[in-house]
């Protein structure tokens, strides 16, 4: 079960990355791991960085509810670590997005799905 979930997650991340590229983003990192958490995708478009959490579920609604407050905090902490490791991006604006993936549906990109102040 865990192996199947892992592969499903990788497939969802590939779909999300392809969707972002089609929207004009450049993928800077995938599966960026820190002691604080993991970021599925770090993407850039112009002077904007998007830290993207990818969620794959049976429906887009189920995927939307899968990003918990605890996960959000881990992603925020990991993003801070990413920014410290990449000072060349310190002047960029950034936001936290979610990419929702469901079978036989186009991905749904939620811009600014959460922020660091919540």
Curated annotation (Swiss-Prot):
InterPro entries the UniProt entry points to: Restrct_endonuc-II-like, tRNA_endonuc-like_dom_sf, UPF0102_YraN-like
Which GO terms of the molecular function aspect are on file? Answer: nucleic acid binding
- Could you tell me which Gene3D superfamilies the record lists for this protein? 3.40.1350.10
Highest taxon in the source lineage: Bacteria
List the signal peptide residues: none
UniProt xrefs under PANTHER family: UPF0102 PROTEIN YRAN
Query: Which family does the record claim for this protein?
Result: Belongs to the UPF0102 family.
Enumerate the HAMAP family for this protein: UPF0102
Identify the NCBIfam families for this entry: PRK12497.1-3, PRK12497.1-5, YraN family protein
Q: What is this protein called?
A: UPF0102 protein Nwi_0116
Organism of derivation:
Nitrobacter winogradskyi (strain ATCC 25391 / DSM 10237 / CIP 104748 / NCIMB 11846 / Nb-255)
């Amino acid at each position: 079960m865990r192996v199947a979930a892992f592969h499903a997650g990788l497939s969802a991340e590939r779909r999300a990355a392809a969707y972002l590229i089609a929207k004009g983003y450049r993928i800077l990192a995938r599966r960026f791991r820190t002691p604080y958490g993991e970021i599925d995708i770090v993407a850039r478009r112009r002077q904007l960085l998007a830290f993207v959490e990818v969620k794959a579920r049976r429906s887009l609604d189920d995927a939307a509810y899968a990003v918990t407050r605890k996960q959000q905090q881990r992603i925020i902490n990991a993003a801070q670590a990413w920014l410290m490791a990449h000072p060349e991006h310190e002047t960029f604006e950034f936001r936290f997005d979610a990419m929702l993936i469901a079978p036989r549906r186009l991905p749904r990109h939620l811009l600014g799905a959460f922020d660091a102040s919540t």
